[in-house]
UniProtKB/Swiss-Prot annotation:
Gene deletion effect: RNAi-mediated knockdown abolishes recruitment of microtubule end-binding protein EB1/ebp-2 to a wound site. Almost completely abolishes induction of nlp-29 expression upon infection with Drechmeria coniospora.
Family, similarity comment: Belongs to the tubulin family.
Protein's recorded name: Tubulin beta-2 chain
One Gene Ontology term from the biological process aspect of the record: microtubule cytoskeleton organization
Region of interest called Disordered, as start-end residue ranges on this chain: 428-450
GO molecular function, one term: metal ion binding
Localization, UniProt: Cytoplasm, Cytoskeleton
Organism of derivation: Caenorhabditis elegans
Amino acid sequence: MREIVHVQAGQCGNQIGSKFWEVISDEHGIQPDGTFKGETDLQLERIDVYYNEANNGKYVPRAVLVDLEPGTMDSVRSGPFGQLFRPDNFVFGQSGAGNNWAKGHYTEGAELVDNVLDVIRKEAEGCDCLQGFQLTHSLGGGTGSGMGTLLISKIREEYPDRIMSSFSVVPSPKVSDTVVEPYNATLSVHQLVENTDETYCIDNEALYDICYRTLKLTNPTYGDLNHLVSLTMSGVTTCLRFPGQLNADLRKLAVNMVPFPRLHFFMPGFAPLSAKGTQAYRALTVAELTQQMFDAKNMMAACDPRHGRYLTVAAMFRGRMSMREVDEQMLNVQNKNSSYFVEWIPNNVKTAVCDIPPRGLKMAATFVGNSTAIQELFKRISEQFTAMFRRKAFLHWYTGEGMDEMEFTEAESNMNDLISEYQQYQEATAEDDVDGYAEGEAGETYESEQ
């Protein structure tokens, strides 16, 4: 079957990663000890995508857990599903990366990376037909961002034809751990642009706003933010884990979602959003789900899709509902808001339906958008980066680990290029002379098609 190897790196990556495993284990009827106690065969039909069936009939996640300090790993191990993971798949150092990208990417992380690759190789060898990898990490710290991107490029070297997907938590001044987050994030994006096929941008600022505004939490904790992330991750992987036709593997998703190789940063959304504990008392209709799902307030990235245009969209509906109604509602949204979808990619919205809803809900919908409005998120980081970099603030922490200022300059300009590429396609119309306005990607793809 088509397996996915999951890697989680750093504190944030391990926290949202282990939450992801709790949620999907629950959805597939896998107990914390790895035994199956589910209700239907649907839960097992594609279980091998994420789990390995051991000799004793227990299911073991195809997960590799990485960190440069033991703390977070210990709490995962002592957590509710800690015994589910393969003990050999915990790989950790003792030094920590101290929120320094250079330590994660060049020094401390580089020392540990071969051990991690050994474990990843072992997992990959246990696969029948590996489709690709998914990494959970944050871009603001040292390990997830620095070592996470190092792992991505090493995996890319060894498995060049496999899909690489990442769930990347983008830093925000509202929920900030460290002052150097803009540096770490920019250096990471510089890597992700080149080395991932699909990146889900999960943005602490958006999560914070959802908790505060929609869920009415006055002091959102990381636990609350991670609860939202796990809903989203469970939603966007539904098609990969349950039987179905559309976007049923990582590559098909990439083919549908990525019109130009560098523009692979997605904005996820989820509906219905209701405060943790007070699950919606009434089931929403398909129309309400669709409405909510496209609402800017439900986006997990702090960008307003109304400030840009959608290149492509994928929507996943979960629960028992009429396919016809789903199709009607999705067409309805596109017709009413046609100006927000680029007209030069016809049929750029794809919909999938899965019968099994998430726990506690009758129906739910997950949204994945490739919108040019994502440039707002990169602009925000870029401005903060430039403010500090102009004064060379905090640079000694990075140059002390052997980095060169040149690398900062390159990362900065790569991110600014990305922003202007999004802008260029936002303004493009179907009538534009394709060769003329884009010497780069659009021109090439256009010529090669003929």
